[in-house]
């Protein structure tokens, strides 16, 4: 199997397209659909949940985690890979049940706004933030 060079992947992401990032076979041995959060559309979420069938996550920096007042999902993370899940989120306004592709895309766009505040989100929700580990 051949892999695309990183500059090509970055160009695809900048253009609003999804790419598949594959981790090591000695880790989870899986692929994740990755795209720029600021460009996510309901059709992208629909594709993810229809074809990838996993959780819809949002990678956030430590600074953004603090800005949004997100706390770890658990106090003691005993998961095999210690993935930094925070509590799940939903946009406080502009959503119905939160589960639709429209609602999830709206929640992501709400959470990444430069001036986003904790009051812009409710918990729990249908988007699962992951605090990035640099």
Explain the meaning of each model-derived region.
Residues 1-134:
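Catalytic domains of riboflavin
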């Amino acid at each position: 199997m051949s892999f695309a060079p990183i500059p090509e992947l970055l160009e695809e992401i900048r253009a609003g397209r999804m790419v598949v990032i594959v981790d090591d076979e000695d880790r989870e041995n899986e692929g994740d659909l990755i795209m720029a959060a600021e460009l996510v559309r309901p059709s992208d979420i629909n594709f993810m949940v229809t074809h990838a069938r996993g959780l819809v996550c949002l990678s956030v920096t430590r600074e953004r985690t603090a800005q949004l007042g997100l706390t770890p999902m658990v106090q003691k993370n005993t998961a095999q890979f210690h993935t930094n899940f925070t509590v799940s989120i939903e946009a406080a306004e502009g959503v119905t049940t939160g589960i639709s592709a429209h609602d999830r895309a709206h929640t992501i766009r709400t959470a990444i706004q430069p001036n986003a505040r904790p009051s812009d989100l409710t918990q729990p929700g249908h988007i699962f933030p992951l605090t990035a580990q640099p």
